[in-house]
A protein has these predicted regions:
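Bacterial Sec-dependent N-terminal signal peptides
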Residues: 1-20
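Subset of outer-membrane beta-barrel
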Residues: 20-270
């Protein structure tokens, strides 16, 4: 029965082909219900490219995400971020699927510090979709945009646009990749406690309200949690910091489809 609901949801929502190309990446993102506008780490390569220019060291990370505990939906990611002068370059590769539907995504992005309080960036993605006899093999280019602005020491705003190019998959029925917008604000109550809120809008679906919290009880542990309204889900996770390594565990709980675990390992070349 669980498999039936999962398959039906993917078909009815038309996300089996579109959404995974824009899957939020990294366990930190997963633990905050996909609220990514004001998170700054190496996973900004995939999430908010505008935040990548805040990266202090060359960093590499890998992750494995399994939606609804279904092996065939598993997504593996690798990202690299390299600071340069007043900006940073980022690279990513991800793959997901099984023998019937495979997706590969390769991306390169650049983020730059535009003054003391504003950061912006752009990322170019090349995606390959192999869906066997139905779609055959297709490839498509698209671009993501991201930016953030510090309004004060405590308050920050961020914006993400995924597939700003409205890239087309096929001429038939004007089939295009979906475009996603996210705008959010974060407030630093202290150096150890950050609360975030935001709105996410896919051009094909109703808007979703997002909220998340980031708490650092000590120098080696970070605890995250988040909620989203559409679809209705809750998320939580924990990160363990050990010198140059950060190990993150997270999961999301969908109202109907269940658990989606994620694990990430980050290494900084300090």
């Amino acid at each position: 029965m669980k498999y039936f609901f999962i398959i039906a949801s993917f078909v009815l929502c038309e996300i089996s082909l579109q959404a995974q190309l824009f899957q939020d990446a990294g366990a930190i993102s997963t633990s905050m219900a996909g609220l990514n506008t004001n998170n700054n780490n190496v996973w900004s390569v995939n999430n908010n490219i505008g935040q990548l220019s805040k990266l202090e060291y060359t960093t590499i990370s890998i992750s494995s995400f399994q939606p609804f505990l279904i092996k065939d939906f598993s997504t593996s990611n690798i990202v690299v971020g390299m600071p340069v002068n007043e900006g940073a370059f980022g690279f990513n590769y991800s793959n997901s699927g099984n023998k019937h539907l495979q997706m590969h995504n390769l991306g390169i992005g650049y983020s730059k510090k535009m003054g003391s309080n504003f950061h912006s960036g752009m990322k170019i993605n090349y995606s390959i979709i192999n869906a066997g006899d139905f779609y055959n093999k297709r490839s498509v280019w698209n671009a993501d945009l991201g930016m953030s602005a510090a309004l004060s020491k405590e308050l920050e705003l961020g914006v993400i646009i995924k597939n700003a190019t409205l890239s087309k998959i096929a001429d038939y029925n004007n089939e295009r990749l979906t475009t996603n917008f996210q705008i959010g604000a974060s407030y630093h109550f202290s150096k150890d406690l950050i609360v975030q809120t935001g709105l996410e809008k896919n051009i094909n679906y109703p808007a979703s309200f997002l909220a998340a919290i980031n708490y650092k009880p000590n120098e080696k542990i970070i605890i995250n949690g988040g909620i989203a309204s559409n679809p209705s889900l809750a998320a939580f996770g924990i990160s363990l910091i050990q010198k140059k390594f950060t190990l993150s565990f997270a999961t999301q709980i969908h109202q109907y489809l269940g658990w989606s675990p994620d694990i990430s390992i980050i290494y900084q070349f300090k």
